[in-house]
Amino acid sequence: MAEGGSPDGRAGPGSAGRNLKEWLREQFCDHPLEHCEDTRLHDAAYVGDLQTLRSLLQEESYRSRINEKSVWCCGWLPCTPLRIAATAGHGSCVDFLIRKGAEVDLVDVKGQTALYVAVVNGHLESTQILLEAGADPNGSRHHRSTPVYHASRVGRADILKALIRYGADVDVNHHLTPDVQPRFSRRLTSLVVCPLYISAAYHNLQCFRLLLLAGANPDFNCNGPVNTQGFYRGSPGCVMDAVLRHGCEAAFVSLLVEFGANLNLVKWESLGPESRGRRKVDPEALQVFKEARSVPRTLLCLCRVAVRRALGKHRLHLIPSLPLPDPIKKFLLHE
């Protein structure tokens, strides 16, 4: 094997010298290099040139390359035209490519889908087009983040609403390969991967509420089992603990109480005006928590929590169709 080569015969980094882009093309493009030299399809997707896309895709040679991963004029990682258009937020190009046969859930070398990069770059229109075309609202299990997590972190409530409307899971599913590994073989050992946690850490109250309305677990924001003993020492032990430690306003605490959080998970006696976290505990938030902890929840509140949990988060959208009086349905929907 030549120096700098790989076991499969592809050239290694050394063979391309300092031209990293060329090496990436050699390693990850879908077709031989001579086919990858023509990047007009990918370049048109990048600049949003719909007319050029229409013209090129009239030819069979380009239609056959619509899902080809290739390095384009301004990019380093080989991507499909759809992924490139979604990154740039060219909604008309995204829509056209899908109608011409582009696969919506193909991933790049990082495991990112077109939907994920549309969300990351804040493109609501492209996000909606991809969701309407059947893109998985949860992104790819081969990527460490999800569209919901990113939208919650940056406070894009409009994008988060769209993801939830199309069935995105608002809880963490901590199984990378559920088809292969035994069920529950991986346990949650940190809250930092959870949408509720990250929305609280960045004080995005609207996103926090949307997640709870969609049925997010108010304690650990996780689908599977939780290993609290595996949490880092000094890290929050539940979502309520995180809300207090991050100095969130009282509204965050009130929402968790309203949605049935287990208040006994927090050792609130150890919390004072100063927190071991990066911020001070909000005095009003701490007072709301202590008051909620000191008195039993009302029967009305307990009934609402019980009904919503019995329905399950994937059937909460059916509440408006239940044969119940409108005031009760609004109550169940927290309206």
From Swiss-Prot:
Pathway: Protein modification; protein ubiquitination. InterPro entries: Ankyrin_rpt (IPR002110), Ankyrin_rpt-contain_sf (IPR036770), ASB1_SOCS (IPR037331), SOCS_box (IPR001496), SOCS_box-like_dom_sf (IPR036036). Belongs to the ankyrin SOCS box (ASB) family. The gene is ASB1. It comes from Homo sapiens. Coiled coil: none annotated. Residues 286-335 form the SOCS box domain. Pfam families: Ank (PF00023), Ank_2 (PF12796), SOCS_box (PF07525). It is found in: Cytoplasm. Keywords: ANK repeat, Cytoplasm, Developmental protein, Repeat, Ubl conjugation pathway. Its main location: cytoplasm. GO terms for biological process: intracellular signal transduction; male genitalia development; negative regulation of cytokine production; proteasome-mediated ubiquitin-dependent protein catabolic process; protein ubiquitination. GO terms for molecular function: ubiquitin-like ligase-substrate adaptor activity. ANK repeats lie at residues 36-68, 77-106, 110-139, 143-172, 191-220, 235-265. This is Ankyrin repeat and SOCS box protein 1. Probable substrate-recognition component of a SCF-like ECS (Elongin-Cullin-SOCS-box protein) E3 ligase complex which mediates the ubiquitination and subsequent proteasomal degradation of target proteins. Mediates Notch-induced ubiquitination and degradation of TCF3/E2A and JAK2. Functions as a tumor suppressor by enhancing CHCHD3 'Lys-48'-linked ubiquitination, leading to inhibition of the CHCHD3/ROS signaling pathway. Suppresses TAB2-linked 'Lys-48' polyubiquitination and consequently facilitates the initiation of NF-kappa-B and MAPK signaling cascades. May play a role in testis development. One of its GO terms (cellular component) is cytosol. The SOCS box domain mediates the interaction with the Elongin BC complex, an adapter module in different E3 ubiquitin-protein ligase complexes. Interacts with CUL5 and RNF7. Interacts with TAB2 and TAB3.
